[in-house]
Amino acid sequence: MAGFDWFWKALGGKQGRNQKRSLAIVDQAEAHTRDLEALDDAHLAARARTLVGDGTPQDPAELLAVLGIAAHRTLGMRPFPVQSQAVLRLIEGDVVHMATGEGKTLVGAMAATGLGLQGKTVHSITINDYLAVRDAEWMRPLVEFFGLSVGAISETMTPEQRREAYRCDVVYGSVSEIGFDVLRDQLITRRADAVQRRADVAIIDEADSVLVDEALVPLVLAGNQPGHAPRGKITEVVRRLKENDHYTVSEDRRNVFLTDKGAAALEQALGITSLYDDEHVGTTLVQVNLALHAQALLIRDIHYIVRDGKVQLIDASRGRVADLQRWPDGLQAAVEAKEGLAVTEGGRILDTITLQALVGRYPMVCGMTGTAVEATDQLRTFYNLHVSVIERNNPLRRFDEADRIYATMAEKNRAIIEEIAHLHHTGQPVLVGTHDVAESEELADALRDLDIEVSVLNAKNDAEEARIIAEAGDIGRVTVSTQMAGRGTDVRLGGPDESHYDQVVELGGLAVIGTARHRTARLDNQLRGRAGRQGDPGLSLFFVSLEDDVVVTGGAGESVTAQPDATGLIDSNRVRDWVAHCQRVTEGQLLEIHSQTWKYNKLLADQRVIIDERRARLLDTDLAWRELSERAQDRAAGLEGVDREVLEQAARDIMLYHLDLNWSEHLALMDDVRESIHLRAIARETPLDEYHRIAVREFKTLAQQAVDDAVETFRTVVIDDRGAHLEDAGLARPSATWTYMVSDNPLAGSGNSVISGIGNIFR
């Protein structure tokens, strides 16, 4: 394997973190296993604690051996050498590339246990509550074997239940719930009210989904102060506008532009002289643009569904309903108005944090995914994380057929149906990956017209996903699914109990069909990875048309000539190379979006750290009382009869109230600046530089204003033996709060999000 050292270095592996060293340690672990198996449980657990007595493993090979023996005794699962290698790489802080079905759950639990034995608090981060609870219960015997505690966080838990879970050595939780708890803990006024304690390590499952696909998704904590819903009149007027007459849409359907005729129609209907007057640019024009985006670009059953009278967003990277997500308030309200639903108020944002900033809070981060190699650049650039490739336990027997490329989408769709029907006729199970709800349902209807029974897994029925996926490998099954990333359940050949395994193997295993290329090869490979699990046979095949989104977007401004046959099929390596080029272009666009958006978010994230540090000092010391009593000595002197502890808490409540309020107002201001910042390009100002200039200036004002406001309140508010009567002074904190995730780019993959594209209305 030494010949592959160059490959490891290309992936960012540091010297010493290479295949050769890892495999040598795993071989040593195998030798240790024979000696250690004679120990009883108590002595084996004691040996593990001895190995990490000073907080670092004295002998990594022996620690791997102990963990492997314990896994076998408690779970009946003996790790393969490649799994032990993955455990080692996680413990040393890498992201491991492990194929689907290679046992990531066990690997993560062994690594968490090994790190827990070193005295570290470990958060094992999943993508949803179901997997967090499932994995915690499944792996509990292994963790507890060594006297460590394990807990799980889920959405329905009370603060006390969360507090108890976070006290554990190993905590399983979804990335959103852990993030929301961070935000809620930033509103406490007494340290004892915090639910979390500082964690040392994050082990992230589906690391590329969390660290790349959703890195810039903001988690939001909001309070019950009404926001501003867009005016209904604008929605009604925009609804009457006609495409190509009143507005035009860009070729990639990512941006919409008002024509002069459209602007005139709006001005007449709204009774204003010009949309572009100063009084309307930051208000009416922004609302018009949001309504236009909602009307022309956001499509029901592709970007969202309507269920139970509510707009529910579809997570583009997973093809399921994003229960906790909403768009920025103006856009959310615009879509609700478009669908004739009750417009929800967004409330006042109290605090927010992106997943990328959340992950940055952990001193050590590692993770697992089946498609880490494709995300190497992003992982190294944004997180300084290195990728370690773990070989399969059994050789890959999946056959990846060359793409079948068609001239038109109609010809492609016809060929897809014919291929599925052909495979189904043989009895071979077929898993079809589509891009959105509408496509999955149209394809399923077409197959049912051919009397083919179809199971559909999409955002409308994701509650059934575990059952549908488990059955997808049985004889004659046809399963149509939106994105397969992070589904968390393996497709087993022969059905859930593998009773028809031999017959399905004889038929060639699971056949995976992609109805189009994704915007990144990584998502294609996530779908491919469902076939050929643990050495099983399998087939993967992608269909592409020259009208597909990835080709149109990635090939914009360029062209390719090709001669299709009578069915529309283009059998040309040159065209296949062209399609791959188009995909690379869209991948580059996504990386640029990430880079640009992070530049906007980074400064706020840095400012947030300063706020966190200030908050911690106010919570944990008497700083608030010292500052206020010094600034308002006469008031402090008049409170000498009040108990010192009460005074310190009263000062703390006052200081924290105004710090939190000013931070919330700063976030709202910077959100407004961000929405209109691209208008500054018209004035030949650099938007990013101007945004940073405003953010720095306003943050300096925030710091001083928070203290000045607190001093003024301290001078006037009633303070007695019960503390500061802030509510009586009209300074109550929100009586209700709620959390959600903001889908900042509903047209994910475009060069402009709805928000960053406000200026585009000027054409």
Swiss-Prot record:
EC number: 7.4.2.8
Binding positions for ATP per the UniProt entry: Q83, G101, E102, G103, K104, T105, D490
Matches recorded under InterPro entries: Helicase_ATP-bd, Helicase_C-like, P-loop_NTPase, SecA, SecA_Actinobact-type, SecA_DEAD, SecA_motor_DEAD, SecA_preprotein_X-link_dom
Keyword Lipid metabolism attributed: no
A biological process term (GO) from this entry: protein import
Membrane topology: Peripheral membrane protein
Cited SMART domains: SecA_DEAD, SecA_PP_bind
Gene3D superfamilies per the UniProt record, alphabetical: Helical scaffold and wing domains of SecA, P-loop containing nucleotide triphosphate hydrolases, SecA, preprotein cross-linking domain
Pfam entry (one): SecA_PP_bind
Cell compartment(s), UniProt: Cell membrane; Cytoplasm
Recorded catalytic activity of this chain's protein: ATP + H2O + cellular proteinSide 1 = ADP + phosphate + cellular proteinSide 2
NCBIfam families: SecA2_Mycobac (TIGR04221)
PANTHER family noted in UniProt: CHLOROPLAST PROTEIN-TRANSPORTING ATPASE, SECA INNER MEMBRANE COMPONENT OF SEC PROTEIN SECRETION SYSTEM
Identification of the protein by name: Protein translocase subunit SecA 2
Organism listed in the record: Corynebacterium efficiens (strain DSM 44549 / YS-314 / AJ 12310 / JCM 11189 / NBRC 100395)
Gene: secA2
